[in-house]
Structures are given as C-alpha cells and as structure tokens.
C-alpha cells in the first residue's frame, strides 16, 4: 500500500499529517448542531418546508447559488450535518491544493511547503465556516484552489487535449467560485502569480492570458443581466467610494483588516493559557504539531531556493487581493458578531507573510518549532471557539424550552417579546442574541411566526422589524396591536461559573448519544436558565412605539 501511495501520491505523508492536525483542530465542527446568525432564518424556513418563501428571500438578494446549494444539501435529510461535513471537507481540500501547488508547481522545499500549508489549514480567521447559511463560501474556496491546482498542472502539458481540457475544467471551477463575489477580485491575484510563474503568458497573451482577464468580467456581465437586488437588501454590498466620509472609512477598514488578519490571531489565544484546561490543550497540540513537523523533516530535506522576500512579497499581494473586495463595500473583518467572515480570503496571504517574517528574523533551525507553537495556539483557539459556540447554542435551547412552557400565553394574540440578556457570558465572544436568533428560537418553540422576539438593544423600529419578518417569512404585519412582553434571560445558579469545559462535555455527550428528552433535561439541570418577567418603572421605547404605530 505504501509503495502504491508513493508512486501515485508521493506527498501522502505530508497530506496525512495536514489532515491529522486539521482534524484535531476542527473535529468539533462536525459535532456542532447549533444555529447561528442567518441560520436561524434560513434553516427555520427549511424546517417549516417554506421553500417558496426561502426562494423569494434569496431571489431578492440575487443569491441563486445559495438557494440551490441548500436545496441539494437538504436531500441528505440532515442539512446541519451536511453543511458541516461540506465545510470541513472544503477547507481540507483547499489545504491539499495549496500544498500540491507549492510542491509540484513552485518546487518549494517539502518542510517549508508543509509549514505554510499547515498555517493555512489551522488558521482561525474564518471561523464562521460553522454557519450553515454561508457554506457556499467554503465551497467557493475549495473550487477556487482546485481550479488553480488543475490549471498549473496542465498549463504546460505537451498534449494539447490534456492542456485545454484541464484549462476548461479549471475555468469552470473558477467561474462557480465567483458566486462568492469576493473571488472576482481575488482571482486577479492568481492571474498575477500565474504571470510571475510563466512569463510566456505575456508574450502569448491572446491564447494564454486573455481568458483569465475576461472570465470575471463575463461572470459579472451575466450576473448583472439578472437585475439588481431589491427589497430590504437593495443597498447591501454597495461600494463606499463616493459616499460621505469614504476615505476615512476605507482607511479604518484597511487597518481593521490588517490587524485582525495578521496580529489578532497571534495575540488573542495567549489569554486562554491562563485556564488550566486550555493550557493542557495547548501542550498536547504543541506536541502533535512538533511531532508532525519532525516526521516531515525526517522524510527528506532539500534547500529552499526561494528567499524570504518572495514569501513576503507574494504574501502581501495575495493578502491585499483578499482584503480589498471587502474594504470596497465597507465590510472590514473584526472578531465580533460573526464579522470575521469578511476575512475568508486572508489565511493564505497571512500564512505566506508569517513564513516570510520567520525566514527573515528567526534562525533556520528554530523556524519549525516557532511554527509549531503558532499552530498549537491556533488549535487551542479553535477548540475554545467550538466550546463557546456550543455553550451559545445550549443557552438558546434552554430559551426554547422556557418559551414552550409559556406557549398558551404567547400565541393567543400577536406578541412582541423584548428580551433582556443577562447571561451574555454563555454567548460566543460574549455576544447577545440577535433578532435572527430570537426569530428562530421562537418559531422552534411555538411553531408560529406571529410572535416576534427582539433584543432590547435592537436599533430598528417596530415597523421595520415587522417588515423584515414579512420579508423573511411572508407573514403580513399584524392588524391588531401586539401585546408587548418584557422577559429577562437569567440563570438561577447564583454566582457559579457554568461556562466550563466540564459542563460542555457533559451536555455534548447527551446531545450526541442521548434522547431529546435527556438532552433538554441535562441542559436544564446544568445551566438552570429561565425567562423572568421584567418589571419596568415606566413604559419602554418598545411600548411607546407599538402604541404609536397602532393608534
């Protein structure tokens, strides 16, 4: 078996070790059953079998690819698991493609290619891959890097039919990846790299380069024939250039992207080491990373002929092409409210920059160990994030159970529930639950969309909230004045810290292997979360708005 692998996939050892480290870091992605952000809208509609409403919602946004991806995944019978498996595989496939490009195309030394690829595979920048409603982003990423690999493997083939069929396949993969529109810009970073690698693209530009230059334009032209987004998302992703204050906005977004894409991932995990359990996780992850590195180093070594300047230069170029499409529409990445989804294209550029800096300032014999430390930090941070995402979901499950207990009171007439979240420590990144979260939880608990839940911090007006609900569900704004109820989300466990790994693993075990009733009971017994009527000394802005709207 080993001889067969060495003959057809000589890189089998490195790819196996990349898979090993990636799985250690992301196995909890496959075990996550939570709904977050837009999942609470999209997947709730799918649960209600409202495919027509789901289509109308996405048609207004011109997100046809999103619809068909979810339609296809629904055939599995478990959209949650299907999206998690797809996201898991897509990023692993992307890592494989990057490693093979570095090894087979650019002839980079084995250990260097392995370390750079591992930094990419373990990067915590796009942690939003857990969100089912944006699984298209992960699919686009895999198709893009596969397209790049196929192109470079066949571009100089002596057999014309292999060359042109391979280029055609890569063009199809690139074209599909453009449904995540940021790849329209990122693609030109690939074009620059292709020219750098093969200067004949310039001398034979009509046959070799022209199709690359025109492919994104062709996609954009076809996309524009479908019309502009309309409805509540008509102005989504509008260019900021020319808008008031656009220069300062773009500068701030650029800095946010640079900080969150390069500095934040290296600094934030260190705080976790103050907690004993995550210090242990770090030590285990470091041992695994170092062992993998030594195995690769021992499999054979050749001198890396590419200097640090090339890694830094191309790292900066690719990082810039990954950041610019988001800065242009005012969507800079930052680590709150799932906004790091705008860092989706940054991991490969960041990995090259990290390696270039290490090659510049760290002696060669220490570089592999430093990368192992960084990888261990990334693994620790990822496991911590999966832990907090699960705790976020368990909190939501407890709220659903409490709402079910009050179903009679909440469904006899249109109701607007104002939630006061007093246990944000349960939330991922201490986030409060959003309008979408409450929509999904209430619909799951009560089986109806006539009751609306909002966080007390919500900035939209009552009128806009009901318009948004109508857009999402097709249910019209209630004709009768809704009853306004104020509820505090609390835990009656006193001052005990319940957000612990021990509690997480205890509930996770029952979630995966127990019955639904056992799962609910374990959450209730462990976290003791309740909805308590909130007494107000005066009318809230929500009471006043509702009365004003229905006068």
Show the residue positions of the predicted features.
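Aromatic- and kink-enriched transmembrane "portal" helix at the membrane-lumen/periplasm boundary
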Residues: 80, 84, 114-143
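Hydrophobic/aromatic-rich transmembrane helices and adjacent perimembrane loops
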Residues: 333-360
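Transmembrane-helix signature of polytopic, membrane-embedded enzymes
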Residues: 98, 102-122, 141-142, 366-369
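Intrinsically disordered, polar/acidic, low-complexity terminal segments
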Residues: 5-6, 11-61, 70, 74-82, ...
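Membrane-interface alpha helices of multi-pass inner-membrane proteins
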Residues: 163-181
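Signature aromatic-anchored transmembrane alpha helix within multi-pass, membrane-resident enzymes
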Residues: 358-382
């Amino acid at each position: 078996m080993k001889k067969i692998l060495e003959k057809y996939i000589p890189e089998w050892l490195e790819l196996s070790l990349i898979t090993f480290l990636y799985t250690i870091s992301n196995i909890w992605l496959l075990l996550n059953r939570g709904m977050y952000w837009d999942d609470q809208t999209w997947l709730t509609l799918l649960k209600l079998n409202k495919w027509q409403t789901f289509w109308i919602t996405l048609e207004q946004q011109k997100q046809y690819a999103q619809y068909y991806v979810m339609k296809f995944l629904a055939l599995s019978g478990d959209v949650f698991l299907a999206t998690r498996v797809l996201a898991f595989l897509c990023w692993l496939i992307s890592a494989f493609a990057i490693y093979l490009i570095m090894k087979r195309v650019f002839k980079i030394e084995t250990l260097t290619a392995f370390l750079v690829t591992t930094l990419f595979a373990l990067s915590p920048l796009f942690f939003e891959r857990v969100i089912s409603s944006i699984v298209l982003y992960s699919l686009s990423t895999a198709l893009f890097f596969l397209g790049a690999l196929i192109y470079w493997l066949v571009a100089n083939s002596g057999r014309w039919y292999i060359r042109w069929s391979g280029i055609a396949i890569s063009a199809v993969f690139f074209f599909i990846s453009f449904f995540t529109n940021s790849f329209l810009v990122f693609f030109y970073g690939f074009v620059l790299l292709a020219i750098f690698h093969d200067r004949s693209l310039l001398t034979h530009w009509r046959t070799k380069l022209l199709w690359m230059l025109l492919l994104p334009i062709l996609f954009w032209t076809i996309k524009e024939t479908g019309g502009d987004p309309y409805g509540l998302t008509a102005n989504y992703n509008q260019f900021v250039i020319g808008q008031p204050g656009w220069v300062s906005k773009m500068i701030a977004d650029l800095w946010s992207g640079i900080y969150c894409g390069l500095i934040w991932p290296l600094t934030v995990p260190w705080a976790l080491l103050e907690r004993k359990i995550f210090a242990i996780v770090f030590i285990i992850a470091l041992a695994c990373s170092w062992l993998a590195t030594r195995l690769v180093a021992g499999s054979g070594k050749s001198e890396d002929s590419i200097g640090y300047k090339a890694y830094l230069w191309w790292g900066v170029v690719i990082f810039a092409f990954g950041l610019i499409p988001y800065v242009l529409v005012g969507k800079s990445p930052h680590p709150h409210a799932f906004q790091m989804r705008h860092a989706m294209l940054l991991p490969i550029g960041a990995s090259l920059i990290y390696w270039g800096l290490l090659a510049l300032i760290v002696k060669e014999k220490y570089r592999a160990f430093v990368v192992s430390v960084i990888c261990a930090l990334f693994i620790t941070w990822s496991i911590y994030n999966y832990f907090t995402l699960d705790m976020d979901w368990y909190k939501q499950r407890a709220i659903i159970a409490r709402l079910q207990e009050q179903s009679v009171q909440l469904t006899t007439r249109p109701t607007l529930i104002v939630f006061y979240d007093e246990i944000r420590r349960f939330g991922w990144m201490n986030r409060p639950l959003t309008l979408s979260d409450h929509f999904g939880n209430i619909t799951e608990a009560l089986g109806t969309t006539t009751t609306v839940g909002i966080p007390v911090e919500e900035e939209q007006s009552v009128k806009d909230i009901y318009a948004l609900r109508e857009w999402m569900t097709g249910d019209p704004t209630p004709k009768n004045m809704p009853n306004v109820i104020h509820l505090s989300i609390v835990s009656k466990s006193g001052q005990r810290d319940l957000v612990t790994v021990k509690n997480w693993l205890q509930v996770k075990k029952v979630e995966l292997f127990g019955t639904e009733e056992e799962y609910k009971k374990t959450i209730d017994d462990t976290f003791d979360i309740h909805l308590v009527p909130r007494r107000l000394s005066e009318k809230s802005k929500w009471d006043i708005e509702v009365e004003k709207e229905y006068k």
